[in-house]
Amino acid sequence: MNNRAGRVFRTCISISFVIVFAFTSFGQAVNRRQLAEQVKTEFLHAWNGYKEHAWGNDDLKPLSKSFHNWYAEPLLMTPVDALDTMYLMGMKGEADKTRKYITDTLKFDKDIYVQNFEITIRILGGLLSNYQITGDKKLLAMADDLGTRLLPVFDSPTGLPYKYVNLKTGKTRGEVTNPAETGTLLIEFGTLSKLTGKPIYYEKDKRALVETYDRRSPIGLVGTNINVETGKWTNTDSHVSAEIDSYYEYLLKCSILFGDADCQSMWQESITKINTYLADEGENMSKKNVNGPVVLGELWYGHADMNTGKRTATTTGALDAFF
């Protein structure tokens, strides 16, 4: 093949690749748009059902077309949860009306005991994310008010948070809790500190996270349940399933979000230990590089006693499998 023929051949091949890539990319883009519209349609179906049958309450019960509230008084769980999704889907008109309803209606001066963990990740987190999207200072003021009402949970002898707090009186209860509820708060409380300039939120929850980590076993694992007044474990089953999973998740996320070196160190140590004692497939080890340990992902994670590493279960759940 002479030079001219070679150039023509290479040009034709290049054009072919460009055409294939263009049509493939176009098809993928169209498919993504179609999928996005399908998701939006399903969201609207659920949202309109909530508006028709459960407006002003926490949740829709779709089969009975009625509503459910988590506590004696509603806290608008669904509207707060859904608001940032509306903005991300481009539903600004509906979102603005919902935001006004939330800021006009939702009050926290209620004589009810709430679960600190759920209220933090759903209501406090929802208010903060929507403030960051909209810049509506009413949302930040509401988050600050709620955060202040939640702070008494940290007033235990250990600094580990109680499970429940009364939003009006500040009284607490629920001394037996779990690592997910003691260690899955720092993103929300830390963000509240950054946005309000009040370090107390970050400091209180950072201490709770560290106190949880410091009570790990000699082989580096945490248990399922702990007493916040004594600091003693009441259930030594260790795993990455419900009641523990998000504790590990927040160690990593907080190291990234806040650049917290302590969280990074706790994460690296923790993931190494759970890969050593809980992972069922793969090499069960960490490799090293110049920047520190590189943890190998595993397919299955089991349950083991936090002190001995001896297996305590023979079944695996979804969270264990996809950690």
Go through the PLM ranges and name each one.
Residues 1-2, 319:
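Intrinsic-disorder/low-complexity regions
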Residues 2-15:
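Bacterial N-terminal signal peptides that target proteins for export
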Residues 5-6, 26-28:
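Intrinsically disordered low-complexity regions specifically enriched for long asparagine
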Residues 12-24:
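Bacterial N-terminal signal peptides
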Residues 27-322:
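Glycan-recognition and catalytic cores of secretory/periplasmic carbohydrate-active enzymes
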